[in-house]
């Protein structure tokens, strides 16, 4: 991580987010009880990253996977506190529950000790301002544009196949000029 942070700083990259999953990483939405990194070892990585940064503005965000991996709130808060104490500039917390309650509880119990980043992929029904009021600092709409792109590509592909022509689709897609600008 030291070398990565140094290289990112050399290139004026604003920050990095590292997560407490073990290698090889598996998708957070697959199963529960996934193994997580040892807290002390992960804290050592955070310290190493922060010690090697060459710009004061560089941010290291620690992604806590305890909730989404099924380890529970107590474990999530314990890890977040350890990572924050070790120098993390912010905490990213994630949940696969659809009601947002787990994230709102975390934010309430966390108490704005440092910035918190959330990724509401599964709890999209909860208005963003509810999280802002509870203390979330950053909201990442992680894959909605990708998913919208997939739907649009499917629609255009179906239309081209159905009409056996590009003409009908041309008015619904970006121009070639738009791609290169």
Model-flagged regions — what are they?
Residues 1-137, 148-154, 158:
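Alpha/beta enzyme core
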Residues 140:
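Active-site loops and adjacent core secondary-structure elements that bind or stabilize anionic groups
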Residues 51, 144-181:
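Extended, intrinsically disordered, low-complexity segments
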